[in-house]
């Protein structure tokens, strides 16, 4: 019943409201889509029931935390969120971090009495959500044949959501064609409940059955089919309908909240063989547990449309709409008529058409009722299906926002399904052929939603929800269209041209292929450049969408990789197809700078966006030698559509070029870079720097700017001017020297201890800087404006600012573009091309010199280690490091034994990417008839040692060599390779030209393991400048410790292959590992923008700041609000919702509510499995969190099962040699120890100790804990000597790290004393046996006390980084005041510098362009302090 409580606005609400806010046509579209789309119905189902299902229902929000709008961050802060669309809310890396993050839970001695000062502080924050929170109303719903149903609804909900609620309930789910009436008045589906005057609490809404139309009858049949196959996982394996898998309830055998606490002696805790330490290649079958029993009972043998359709004219006049054909489980065959009043059996047979009702006739408004009447088997099976359906968690039934594909799938039975067949061959999506205008106008929908008002919080929620809904539909349609294009099912709009130049329009979406059409990219790398251009263009669309300048429009863009092809799908600008491009473009250039146009409106709009994106306005000469001003790259085109909107497209050069990968005569790189092998000539000249790098670079320069300005301000305040001048002469070289040191001081081998020693000094410097600025500020403001201006000028010069008297860092993206003539400004000014080039060079150097070492240094602590290549790529991108630097990163990691796991993951990622390039080349030239054989052959060459013999008959080969192999081969035969992998690579490893590679559709048969490995080696050297120094894949596996199953998983996910779920023997010498039957499917790899929920993000980050200050309850309330807002925007199922749930579960646990933590974390696990994937790294971490909360709730056996699942998935993903495996093994060992399984426990803890020694060193706290756990286990086994030795190691580490007086050291000393006593006692007994041959009775017995569950939980908390400490109220106040003091110091520095600069620049007319807002800086400061406290307490 929880689903019926606390309703929130759903996605249907969005589209309904958006429609109402725009046009009636849109409203009609959404109405039709909602009715016909299973995805929308499912989303509305849980969404409409809101936070009771997904939000923490047990915690109520305090009224003091309410306001009219969420915490607002500045434009810069908003941008910093917008640039990484795939990034989750910051909780993944901050206060929540991961299982290793040490969190200090403060138990306040005053139980519930919060600090009044804190309450006052929160009251001053402008946080109120009265606009979203209402008391709700209780409404009675009367359904025909059912009892009166009472539900609580939000007044903001739409009537449509009551429809979805009823369609999900067991007793009313079979109804689809009905209206809702109040006092005999039919309610409008898109009306908000609060707008209905007669509706009040206690009102009764009546469900009235409506007559069917053709459309409604089809919708009803589709809904019945969905109900019957609700438990069938086939759609999830096939990757359709936005369905996906979850196995949590299979692992736990039901809802964890319904489980009773288990006694330790009743737990079956034996781990499966594949989970115990030492397994080399984990099996594949456990990845999908119990898949054979997932389908559920079969209710019908066949339900399909009849061949007698459509009804002839006379029968239409009798009300017939369509005919169905059914075979029941009793083998009876029925022909069914659908008429306006419902469904009935007619007298037709397979051979005879007789549409009259059968005798006796039975008419039912619901097809389910009719089938239950004629088939007892159907009635029983349907009841069983419904019972199982309602037992499933709500999150298991909701559609995901985007399709998640499985890389392994079982053999699925292919059943008769008319609706599936109809969907496969219909040209539209679902029921869209019935909406006005036939097809959706994607561009109009995308742009209209962006134009919705955004001034108030409800308006912003409606707008963001509408954007998200339309974008999700567009991605689904674009993906389906791209697959249809590559499969040859769409006619080109220019069919007479060469196949690689063909373009397509399907469902109002424009599709183009990743080839260099008309030599457009000839000077930039040809097809290589054409292949990567869509990806860079997508980056540009993403950042301009994030900036969200009103009046500036981008195209809906999706990039799809499928079967070796890259397809770009874009919405269509109104009118662009009616005229030539030369006539359309009013801004930018269509020929890379030969002709350049500008437009005042575009300059105005792009100048606004450029402030956030750090793009420098610049001027270039056009073909008539006239200067033309631009506020973007030359390639960026501005087109005014027929709708009057200003569109920008071709945003591939939004950010400046990466000179480290361009060989340019005018660029002289530093000696350090040259020694590292730069510049490297890349395959294309479109390499650009990432936005994250530019932000980090500007932030670094800003810190230096403040430091230098502070030093000069101190000089201004000196008592004697003469001394000041002489000091200035001394200080200036010192500052420059400090700058030099600052560049070089980032040593990746710096130890944590060294880092801690530096902290107090930095704090003192910061305080001195603040004091100096404060003292100087008054002088600057009154009489020292000239001197202040000089200070700013010197600081700007020292950091290389683009402006002489203002901190300004913006980049010219065209500065190194060939063929563009720049208007050169005065030397030293922002218009100086030389200065612009130097800045871009400095940013590229910053990446290599600072960011790569910073990346490595960050992972030295192993606090949140990457688990697979996807994790690694995300981490690199967050530091602004492009994947083309992977070779350089690998070289750095290879010199560090403590980074061995990351080195292995990076090498595997490089091998997978190199293999992808080669694989795509062969797939393009493969005949469609032989795709499965070709793919299995390629996998055999990549992964196995057995004989490789592709099965293709010689006759067929010779016959096909002469022809083009049909429609598909027409694409492939002329295209050859594309993009990064465009030219095929011949057997000797050399590249051939595009034409020669495409000549043969059977090139794949010539691939051998040896030739493939040689190509991979050449690719790794050519693309990443890294020597893969192994002579075969086998030697590489052994050298780097890579498992074949891990490589198979990574490669399948990377290129979109689905293999059969079975065990593969990679070492077979007699037959190939893969056969053509092992290739189940090929799925698309889709790249798109993820719309964001800005208000939810602001609440989330504010909540994080509270948590970092120790204000857990306030943080919980803010993050709960963030989750509510996310539910409003994204619906119940989204990655960011999962991050919020994980954080809330952790906070509940820290606040002492383990049961609430378990309930919330269970939802987080299901959500992660559904939206990320069942073996995604995030899912693995969610499982480990859930196991801890399960143990805390007394579910000991479940806790072990969850840990076994997490360990299996982790080993399948990256192998056993990983710091995260050490954490899981420590948890497993401790729980097994508590259950008395000492031998098993010892195996796991020995493995954990081995890994901890390797990755943390022999003096680390992790190692001390592992030694202590081993000692405890061995003492329980009676092996006191070994226990004593291990506890001595623990004592030694504690003593050296913490000192003799520390509590942990004293505890270890006491443990040593007890072990020594037991060891002496045991020795006495042994001596007695040896001397007397029997035991004497006077020796006391050896007593081994098993640990209590409380002590085990305490130790589990310690291992997982959670430490509960008792702190007095005075200490809490002291810590908070210290945090506030540091925050204030940071704020004062910024404010003082800004004021001083403003005074120096014409009495405050200019301002410093700081790289980030104060909120972010404060959060960083709080995080820094919290981290320091963590170390101290966890020690």
From Swiss-Prot:
SUPFAM superfamilies, alphabetized: Hypothetical protein c14orf129, hspc210, TPR-like
Biased composition (Basic residues): 58-67, 959-975
Organism: Drosophila persimilis
A GO CC term assigned to this protein in UniProt: cytoplasm
Polar residues biased stretches: 38-50, 1417-1435
Region entry Disordered, spans: 1-97, 719-762, 952-998, 1407-1435
TPR repeat residue numbers: 1096-1129, 1222-1255, 1257-1290
Biased composition annotated in UniProt, kind: Low complexity: 18-35, 988-998
PROSITE patterns recorded: CLU
Bias type Basic and acidic residues, positions: 719-731, 752-762
InterPro entries in UniProt: CLU-central, CLU_dom, CLU_N, CLU_prot, GSKIP_dom, GSKIP_dom_sf, TPR-like_helical_dom_sf
Protein name as catalogued: Protein clueless
């Amino acid at each position: 019943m929880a689903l019926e409580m606390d309703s929130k606005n759903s996605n249907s609400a969005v589209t309904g409201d958006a429609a109402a806010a725009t046009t009636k046509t849109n409203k009609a579209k959404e109405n039709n889509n909602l009715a016909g789309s299973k995805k929308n119905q499912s989303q509305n189902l849980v969404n409409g029931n809101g936070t009771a299902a997904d939000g923490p229902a047990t915690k109520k929000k305090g009224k003091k935390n309410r306001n009219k709008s969420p915490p607002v961050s500045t434009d810069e802060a908003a941008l910093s969120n917008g640039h990484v669309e795939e990034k989750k809310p910051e909780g993944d890396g901050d206060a929540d971090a991961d299982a290793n993050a040490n969190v200090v839970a403060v138990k306040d001695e005053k139980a519930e009495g919060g600090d009044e000062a804190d309450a006052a502080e929160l009251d001053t924050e402008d946080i109120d959500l009265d606009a979203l929170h209402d008391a709700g109303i209780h409404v009675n719903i009367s359904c025909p044949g059912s009892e009166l149903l009472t539900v609580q609804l939000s007044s903001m909900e739409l009537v449509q959501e009551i429809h979805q609620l009823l369609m999900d309930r067991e007793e009313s789910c079979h109804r689809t064609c009905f209206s809702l009436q109040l006092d005999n008045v039919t309610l409008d589906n898109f009306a908000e409940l609060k707008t209905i005057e007669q509706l009040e609490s206690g009102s009764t809404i009546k469900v009235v059955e409506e007559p069917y139309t053709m459309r409604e009858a089809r919708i009803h049949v589709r809904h019945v089919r969905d109900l019957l196959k609700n438990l069938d996982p086939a759609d999830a394996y096939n990757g359709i309908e936005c369905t996906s898998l979850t196995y949590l309830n299979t692992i736990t055998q039901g809802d964890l909240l319904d489980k009773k606490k288990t006694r330790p002696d009743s737990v079956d805790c034996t781990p499966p063989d594949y989970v115990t330490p030492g397994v080399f290649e984990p099996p594949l079958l456990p990845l999908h547990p119990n898949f054979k029993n997932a389908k559920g009972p079969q209710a019908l043998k066949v339900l399909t449309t009849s061949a007698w359709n459509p009804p002839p004219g006379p029968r239409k006049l009798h009300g017939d709409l369509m005919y169905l054909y059914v075979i029941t489980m009793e083998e009876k065959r029925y022909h069914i008529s659908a008429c306006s009043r419902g469904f009935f059996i007619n007298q037709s047979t397979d051979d005879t058409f007789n549409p009259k009702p059968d005798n006796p006739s039975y008419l039912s408004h619901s097809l389910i009722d009719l089938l239950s009447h004629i088939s007892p088997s159907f009635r029983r099976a349907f009841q069983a299906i419904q019972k199982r359906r309602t037992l499933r968690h709500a999150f298991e039934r909701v559609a995901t926002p985007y399709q998640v594909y499985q890389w392994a799938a079982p053999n699925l039975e292919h059943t008769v399904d008319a609706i599936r067949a109809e969907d496969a061959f219909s040209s539209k999506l679902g029921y869209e052929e019935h909406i006005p205008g036939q097809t959706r106008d994607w561009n109009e929908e995308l742009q209209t939603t962006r134009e919705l008002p955004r001034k108030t919080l409800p308006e912003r929620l409606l707008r963001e929800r509408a954007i998200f809904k339309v974008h999700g539909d567009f991605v689904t349609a674009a993906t389906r269209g791209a697959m249809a294009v590559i499969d040859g099912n769409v006619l080109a709009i220019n069919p007479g041209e060469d196949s690689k130049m063909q373009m397509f329009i399907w469902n109002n979406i424009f599709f183009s292929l990743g080839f260099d059409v008309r030599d457009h990219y000839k000077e930039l790398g040809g097809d290589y450049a054409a292949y990567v251009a869509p990806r860079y263009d997508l980056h540009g669309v993403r950042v301009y969408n994030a900036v969200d300048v009103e009046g500036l429009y981008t195209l809906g863009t999706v990039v799809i990789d499928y079967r070796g092809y890259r397809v770009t799908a874009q919405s269509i600008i109104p009118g662009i197809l009616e005229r030539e491009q030369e006539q359309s473009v009013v801004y930018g250039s269509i020929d890379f700078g030969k002709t350049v146009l500008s437009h005042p409106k575009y300059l105005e709009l792009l100048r606004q966006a450029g402030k956030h994106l750090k793009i420098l306005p610049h001027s270039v000469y056009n073909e008539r030698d006239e200067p033309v001003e631009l506020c973007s790259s030359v390639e960026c085109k501005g087109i005014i559509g027929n709708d009057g909107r200003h569109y920008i497209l071709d945003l591939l050069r939004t950010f400046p070029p990466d000179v480290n990968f361009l060989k340019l005569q005018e660029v002289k790189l530093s000696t350090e870079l040259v020694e590292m092998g730069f510049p490297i000539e890349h395959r294309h000249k479109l390499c650009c720097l990432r936005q994250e790098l530019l932000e980090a670079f500007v932030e670094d320069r800003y810190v230096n700017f403040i430091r230098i300005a502070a030093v000069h301000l101190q000089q201004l305040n000196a008592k004697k001017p003469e001394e000041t001048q002489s000091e200035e002469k001394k200080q200036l070289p010192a500052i420059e020297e400090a700058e030099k040191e600052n560049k070089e001081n980032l040593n990746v081998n710096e130890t944590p201890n060294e880092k801690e020693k530096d902290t107090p000094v930095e704090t003192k410097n910061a305080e001195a800087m603040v004091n100096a600025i404060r003292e100087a500020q008054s002088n600057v403001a009154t009489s020292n404006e000239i001197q202040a201006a000089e200070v700013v000028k010197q600081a700007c010069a020292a950091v290389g600012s683009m402006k002489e008297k203002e901190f300004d860092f913006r980049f010219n993206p065209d500065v190194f573009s060939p063929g563009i003539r720049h208007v050169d400004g005065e030397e030293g000014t922002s218009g100086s091309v030389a200065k612009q080039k130097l800045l871009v060079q400095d940013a590229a150097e910053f990446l290599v010199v600072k960011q790569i070492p910073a990346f490595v240094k960050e992972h030295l602590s192993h606090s949140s280690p990457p688990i697979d290549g996807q994790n690694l790529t995300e981490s690199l991108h967050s530091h602004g490091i492009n994947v083309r630097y992977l070779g350089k990163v690998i070289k750095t990691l290879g010199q560090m034994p403590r980074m061995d796991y990351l080195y292995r993951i990076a090498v595997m990622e490089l091998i997978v990417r190199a293999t992808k390039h080669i694989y795509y080349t062969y797939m393009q030239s493969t005949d469609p008839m032989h795709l499965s054989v070709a793919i299995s052959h390629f996998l055999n060459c990549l992964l196995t040692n057995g004989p490789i013999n592709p099965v293709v008959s010689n006759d067929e080969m010779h016959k096909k060599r002469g022809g083009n192999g049909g429609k598909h081969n027409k694409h492939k035969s002329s295209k050859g390779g594309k993009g990064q992998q465009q030219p095929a690579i011949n057997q000797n490893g050399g590249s051939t030209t595009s034409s020669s590679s495409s000549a043969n559709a059977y090139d794949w048969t010539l691939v051998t393991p040896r030739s493939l490995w040689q190509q991979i080696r050449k690719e790794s050297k050519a693309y990443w400048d890294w020597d893969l120094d192994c002579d075969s894949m086998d030697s590489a596996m052994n050298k780097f410790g890579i498992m074949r199953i891990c490589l198979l998983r990574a490669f399948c996910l990377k290129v979109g292959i689905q293999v059969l779920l079975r065990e593969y023997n990679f070492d077979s010498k007699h037959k190939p590992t893969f056969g053509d039957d092992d290739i189940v499917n090929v799925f698309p790899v889709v790249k798109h923008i993820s719309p964001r929920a800005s208000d939810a993000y602001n609440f989330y980050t504010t909540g994080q700041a509270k948590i970092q200050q120790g204000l857990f309850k306030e943080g919980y309330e803010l993050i709960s609000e963030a989750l509510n807002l996310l539910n409003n925007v994204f619906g119940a199922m989204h990655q960011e919702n999962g991050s919020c749930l994980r954080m809330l579960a952790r906070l509940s646990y820290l606040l002492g509510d383990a049961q609430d933590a378990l309930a919330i974390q269970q939802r987080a696990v299901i959500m992660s499995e559904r939206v990320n994937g069942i073996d995604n790294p995030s899912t693995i971490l969610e499982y480990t969190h859930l196991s801890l909360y399960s143990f805390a709730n007394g579910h000991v056996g479940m806790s072990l099962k969850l840990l076994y699942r997490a360990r299996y998935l982790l080993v399948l993903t990256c192998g056993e040699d990983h710091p995260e495996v050490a954490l899981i093994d420590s948890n497993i060992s401790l729980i097994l120890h508590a259950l008395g399984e000492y031998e098993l426990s010892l195996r796991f803890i020995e493995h954990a100790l081995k890994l901890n020694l390797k990755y943390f060193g022999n003096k680390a706290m992790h190692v001390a804990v592992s030694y202590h756990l081993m000692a405890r286990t061995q003492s329980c086994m009676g092996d006191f000597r070994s226990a004593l030795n291990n506890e001595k190691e623990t004592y030694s580490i504690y003593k050296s790290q913490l000192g003799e007086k520390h509590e942990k050291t004293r505890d270890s000393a006491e443990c040593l004393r007890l072990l020594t006593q037991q060891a002496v006692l045991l020795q006495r007994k042994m001596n007695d046996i040896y001397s007397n041959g029997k035991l004497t009775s006077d020796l006391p017995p050896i007593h081994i006390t098993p640990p209590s569950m409380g002590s085990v939980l305490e130790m589990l908390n310690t291992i997982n980084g959670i430490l509960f400490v008792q702190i007095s109220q005075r200490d809490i106040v002291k810590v908070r005041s210290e945090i506030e003091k540091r925050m204030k110091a940071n704020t004062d520095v910024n404010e003082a510098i800004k004021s001083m600069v403003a005074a120096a620049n014409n009495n405050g007319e200019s301002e410093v362009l700081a790289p980030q807002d104060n909120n972010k800086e404060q959060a960083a400061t709080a995080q820094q302090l919290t981290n320091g406290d963590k170390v101290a307490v966890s020690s």
